[in-house]
A protein has these predicted regions:
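Short, glycine/small-residue-enriched coil/turn segments at secondary-structure junctions
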Residues: 60-61, 91-125
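Polar/charged, compositionally biased leader and regulatory segments
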Residues: 1-99
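Short, well-structured beta-strand-loop connectors
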Residues: 112-121, 153-168
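Residue-level recognition of beta-strand microenvironments
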Residues: 73, 123-124, 151, 168-171
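Short, acidic/hydrophobic/Gly-rich beta-strand patch recurrent on exposed beta strands
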Residues: 101-104, 132-137, 184
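Conserved, short, structured surface segments that act as functional micro-motifs
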Residues: 157-209
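Zn2+-dependent peptidoglycan hydrolase active-site motif and core
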Residues: 114-149
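Envelope-exposed proteins and targeting segments
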Residues: 66, 97-99, 108, 116, ...
Length: 209
């Protein structure tokens, strides 16, 4: 009798295990049947914050406060003869067209600001032009700041519009201006008159240049 019960118990356990195995196999088969091939699974893209995303809508601002004055303008051939003469730079016996705008404040130092957001691609001390910082913006536009002092940025830094990048300093090339900022706007490696592009968006500057 005990042997019969033992055999029945083993049979019960075996049958139960077999039943559970078959049920599990059926569930797995159903899951596998409903699986989609890898290439059929839609890819969900996650947008990341891009600091340069809105640069195109920024307007180009002057790199100085309103109390800082223009001491020498850009040599623009559309100007009259008097202004063209004023936009010449005399150095070592030669007159050269001014490729930017020079700002002064009665020989006082003043803060210099990033005209638009971008990346610092150059920080260099030039023997004639003094300390130079170049910021690259979108659309092939660069702003260049020469004759700087007390520079606050390094090459590779991401700067936002209005960040202080340094102070006005001195250089050899325009030593008669004493403390000043020489500011250049370059589009596709060509210098342009900054006055024509202030208060325009970066996007518009590129399309109209």
């Amino acid at each position: 009798m005990k042997g019969l019960l033992k055999r029945n118990k083993k049979t019960f356990i075996f049958m139960t295990s077999l039943l559970l195995f078959l049920i599990g196999a059926g569930v797995i088969q159903e899951i596998v049947k409903n699986l989609k091939p890898f290439e059929d699974v839609p890819v969900v893209s996650v947008e990341t914050k891009d600091e340069n995303k809105n640069q195109g809508s920024e307007i180009l601002k002057k790199p100085v406060n309103d109390d800082v004055k223009v001491s020498k303008g850009f040599y623009d051939t559309s100007l009259d003869d008097k202004k063209l003469e004023e936009a010449l730079v005399y150095f070592e016996g030669v007159y050269r067209p001014n490729d930017g705008i020079d700002y002064t404040k009665d020989n006082e130092s003043f803060d210099v600001y990033a005209s638009a957001s971008g990346t610092v691609i150059r920080k260099e001390n030039d023997s004639l032009l003094g300390w130079i910082v170049t910021i690259e913006h979108q659309k092939g536009i660069q702003t260049i700041y020469q004759s700087l002092d007390d520079i606050k940025v390094e090459k590779g830094d991401q700067v936002k519009q209005g960040d202080v990048i340094g102070k006005a300093g001195n250089n050899v090339y325009q030593s008669t201006l004493k403390k000043h900022l020489h500011f250049i706007v370059s589009i596709d490696d060509k210098t342009v008159n900054p006055d024509k592009y202030f208060n325009q968006t970066i996007e518009k500057i590129k399309t109209t240049s």
